Amino acid sequence: MTGAVQEDKRIRRTKKLLRQALTRLMQQKDFQSITVTDVVREADINRGTFYAHYRDVYDLREKIEAEMKKIVKEDLPITRYTKSRADAIAYFKEKNEPYKVELIEDLPEDAQISFYQQGEFVDLCAGPHLMTTKPVKAIKLTSLAGAYWRGNEKNKMLTRIYGISYPKKAQLDEYLTMLEEAKKRDHRKLGKELGLFMMCEEGPGFPFFLPKGMVLKNTLLDYWRELHKKAGYVEVSTPIILSRHLWETSGHWDHYKENMYTTQIDGEDFAIKPMNCPGGMLVYKAEPRSYKDLPLRVGELGLVHRHEKSGQLHGLMRVRCFTQDDAHIFMTPEQIKDEIKGVVHLINQVYSLFGFKYHVELSTRPEDSMGSDEDWELATEGLRGALNDLGLDYVVNEGDGAFYGPKIDFHLTDSIGRTWQCGTIQLDMQLPQRFELEYTGADGEKHRPIMIHRVAFGSIERFIGILIEHFAGAFPTWLAPVQVKVLPISDKHLEYGQKVLDTLNAAGIRAEIDTRAEKIGYKIREAQMQKIPYMLVVGAKEEEENLVSVRSRFAGDEGQKSLDEFVASVTEEIATRARREVVKEEN
């Protein structure tokens, strides 16, 4: 009996070592590239011992999931109870869990700590939980990653395990299919393949836009400027570095300093702007304002810098430097609803252009905020009233507003069903007060304006990342960095190919020519891999009759067309910013 127990302990220890080895390896590289040799070397266990318990690395991961599923089937009740702060600290010290002790020690002395028990497993958790494990029908461990304790690079790196569960297996399968599609669309992978941007270790979190990426970015900015000019906005540009005094006035120094980059100039404290708003206040104050000047809609494509922890950086989605498409609208109280409606209409135009559906959320006052209860109530009801007047469905997020005012957030749904928060409308009565903004009313008296902060794209860089994944790199023609690729069949047709290229460029179409001495099939495939909307094959027949053979990303072989006909068709597609639907997939 004693020998059997001892053997069981050894087996448990061996399996634990193998699981820990797999966990460490999954932090370092993709799961698919991990071999049994990697695992046994990491665990310092021989191969024979590994195979005594598992067929391969996949079997090891599946056994971990199987153990989880076994717990689910046991239909274990999940019970909640509380301990005093002192008892909770003593409990976890006995269990040798210093991280949980540290969390509890940060809580007030009179705090009651909630615990949850599931079978023999007990843990600290705020909850709430299910009543039992039974409703969890489908489980999948998706990945593991390293994470510094409390997000601080100076602390020990721990293992973060990612998993997902659904009440039905079909829902899990649908989610896993979406994950696979997301991997194919990863903007970091496509950004490199399509030559759009790069990231360097010399500037972590600071993206480098390459020539094609700059074409894409500038095309978006041109659209932004055109749209805002039509909507009655003026554009300004404010400095990147501004004095500490400004940030103290705005409240950022007290509420946001940990995310700001600071420096000294001539012995004075300065900060690189994390937001465009305070500079916009100075623009408003630069001259006297009258009620006749309001609403004043001021837009800025401002470069901002925010310190993000290295573990939170992610391609273009989470960076330390980005262009914010801010606008500040200064208005009278009577103009609030109409201006909010105008902003909603503008944001709807932007998202509709790219085929995004969206839902709306209203976020209210957070714990760390400034301003009176009366101001917050008035601002919140202003946003709520506008949404109600527009007949928009919305969800209320209590306590999730900005520190200076409530906000409306727009959450986009992309082509594979993921949601992204982009557009924001924030009603602010605090900054106009802190900066002592005024206008002369119809009564000749001085009044304080109300202000809206709003963004449509949000971060331009992040929006580009979203677009790359939404379109899988296959951008609409108007947005594509290269819209047409001219493909001469052989060197004999280079001269005609150049003539076609010159005609396209003269019409304002972004075009390139492939002059390499490669087979035409290879050239076509290369252009397809670069997601180029149109390929024009030119040979002897095309040259003789001033034609082009058109292949498109949307319909495959579209046959021969006159060059003038093709140019007219594509310039119309670009001018109207049309999105052609794919009717035939290219092989």
Give the location of each predicted region.
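Short, amphipathic alpha-helix enriched in basic
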Residues: 13-35
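Append "Primarily bacterial transcriptional regulators
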Residues: 18, 37-42, 50
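Short coil turns linking two alpha-helices in DNA-binding domains
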Residues: 14, 46-47
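HTH DNA-binding helix-turn interface
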Residues: 2-6, 27-31, 44-45, 51-61
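NTP/phosphate- and nucleic-acid-binding module
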Residues: 62-587
